[in-house]
């Protein structure tokens, strides 16, 4: 009997750990942000001054961290380069044919990863309290963009949500869920600017 309980316990532990690896780390959780940071600490990003850093989730209505894209000026080529990294590997660099960006640059150390989870919690509370958005539910952060303006790091969040009561529909073999998306930018005074996608 004791062996049976031990086997059941081991099986349960394996099932729980297996399921947790399937769910992944939320994009704006401490674990998801740490994954992004670790990717940005590796080549080709090491020591780079970025003009934009973007964190991405997977498919629409997913919020688990999938990849990070960084834009930076490449001295050798004299061009802006954009490159995406994920745990699966690194994409080929996308070299811009335009003139180099005049955007302010920033380093990895300047990105306020530690402030993001609390900022997102406050932002979701703010969105939930808005009368214009009372029909919406299930807010998730699908992407996060860091830039620098006037010497300050700015974040722009892509929020996705569903409408109460819409549910899902079936079209052939596909299950369809309508979703809505918009951007939210925190302001220096603690408010939020909401803009259309």
Where in this protein do the model-derived segments appear?
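Sec-dependent N-terminal signal peptides
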Residues: 6-12
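C-terminal motif of bacterial Sec signal peptides marking the signal peptidase cleavage site
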Residues: 15-18
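Bacterial signal peptide processing site
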Residues: 20-22
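Short glycine-rich, low-complexity/disordered patches
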Residues: 26-31, 38-63, 125-153
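Exposed beta-strand-loop-beta-strand "reactive/processing" segments of non-cytosolic proteins
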Residues: 47-80, 144-179
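A short, surface-exposed beta-strand/turn
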Residues: 78-100, 168-197
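Long, charged/polar, surface-exposed segments that mediate recognition or autoinhibition
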Residues: 91-139
């Amino acid at each position: 009997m004791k062996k049976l309980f031990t086997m059941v316990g081991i099986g349960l532990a394996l099932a729980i750990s297996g399921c947790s690896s399937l769910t992944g780390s939320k994009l704006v959780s401490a674990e998801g942000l740490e994954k992004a940071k670790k990717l940005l600490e590796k080549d080709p990003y090491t020591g780079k001054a970025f003009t934009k850093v973007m964190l991405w989730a997977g498919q629409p209505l997913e919020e688990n961290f999938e990849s990070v894209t960084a834009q930076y000026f490449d001295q050798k080529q004299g061009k802006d380069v954009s490159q995406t990294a994920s745990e699966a590997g690194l994409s080929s660099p996308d070299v811009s044919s335009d003139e180099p960006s005049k955007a302010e640059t920033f380093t990895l150390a300047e990105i306020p990863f530690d402030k993001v989870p609390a900022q997102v919690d406050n932002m979701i509370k703010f969105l939930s309290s808005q009368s214009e958005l009372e029909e919406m539910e299930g807010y998730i952060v699908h992407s996060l963009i860091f830039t620098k303006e006037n010497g300050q790091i700015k974040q722009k969040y892509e929020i996705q949500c569903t409408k109460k009561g819409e549910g899902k529909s079936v079209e052939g073999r596909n299950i369809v869920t309508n979703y809505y998306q918009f951007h939210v930018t925190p302001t220096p005074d603690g408010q939020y600017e909401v803009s259309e996608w």
